A protein has these predicted regions:
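Conserved alpha-helical positions within TPR/SEL1-like repeat arrays
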Residues: 47-58, 85-99, 124-139, 150, ...
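Short coil/turn linkers that connect adjacent helices within long alpha-helical scaffolds
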Residues: 38-40, 78-82, 117-121, 159-163, ...
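Short coil/turn linking the two alpha-helices of tandem helical-hairpin repeats
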Residues: 13, 53, 80, 95-98, ...
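Structural signature of alpha-solenoid helical repeat junctions
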Residues: 4, 25, 41-44, 64, ...
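Amphipathic alpha-helices of TPR/Sel1-like and other helical repeat/solenoid scaffolds
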Residues: 5-44, 48-55, 59-80, 104-114, ...
């Protein structure tokens, strides 16, 4: 059954932090599905595309990413198909592949504009959009706007009790590095220490996520020339 195939591919794409050596075959299968499958359950199909895209992004598989964007565009043309979140994700995906910074920033802003009311169902998405926009502002020399959107993304995770999910790790790590660049390393360290505690509570101190946070802490201590502390965190 097509449902079983879609489900199994989605499960692979949602396995956090796990890379597979057969990713090319996986993406070819996804491409064949886009081309050949009968799309009779549109919400499920859209969700499939939206879960596969970030996994392709991990491998910089631009051919497949472009195919997914085109497919989403085709499906979301009629206003009665898809949700505000689907449309926001399409714009976010377009921003991912956009080379011009001003255009990418506009696409992320348009993505945020799609969602009028933030709810428990879309808070994670809105938080990610703010984080992405903050990252673009940071890379393009707009520290005040970067700070505004990064802080908004983290406050949404906090507000909706989502700080323990995997999305929070790159968001808080990037924010901590940004604070260090802005000569506020103590605040960055404090944010990462809080995150370490949350990961330890919800998961363990023996997982990849915990190690990533320790690595970021070590990097910040290295940047601030605190070698003993840097060594401690790199060892963890």
């Amino acid at each position: 059954s097509c449902h079983i195939l879609l489900d199994s591919l989605q499960k692979i794409c949602l396995m956090h932090g796990i890379e597979v050596d057969y990713y090319k075959k996986l993406f070819q299968t996804a491409g064949n599905i886009i081309e050949l499958i009968e799309k009779d359950d549109i919400p499920k199909y859209l969700l499939f595309l939206e879960n596969v895209f970030p996994y392709m992004d991990n491998y910089n598989y631009q051919k497949g990413m472009k195919e997914i964007i085109q497919e989403l565009k085709n499906f979301l043309k009629p206003k009665d198909i898809g949700t505000d979140s689907d449309r926001a994700l399409l714009l976010d995906f377009q921003a991912t592949l956009e080379i011009k910074p001003e255009k990418a920033i506009k696409l992320e802003k348009d993505a945020l504009a799609q969602i009028e009311n933030i709810t428990a169902d879309n808070a994670r998405l809105v938080s990610n959009l703010h984080a992405n926009l903050g990252g673009l502002y940071r890379m393009n020399g707009h520290p005040d706007l970067a700070r505004e959107h990064m802080e908004k993304s983290i406050s949404l995770l906090d507000q909706f009790n989502l700080l323990h999910i995997n999305d929070s790790i790159p968001q808080i790590a990037n924010y901590a590095m940004f604070l260090t660049e802005q000569q506020e390393p103590e605040r960055g360290i404090s944010e990462l220490q809080k995150l370490s505690g949350i990961i330890k509570e919800y998961h363990s101190d023996d997982c990849l996520d915990y190690a990533k946070v320790q690595e970021t802490l070590g990097t910040i201590y290295l940047m601030t020339a605190n070698l003993p502390q840097a060594k401690t965190h790199f060892k963890r």
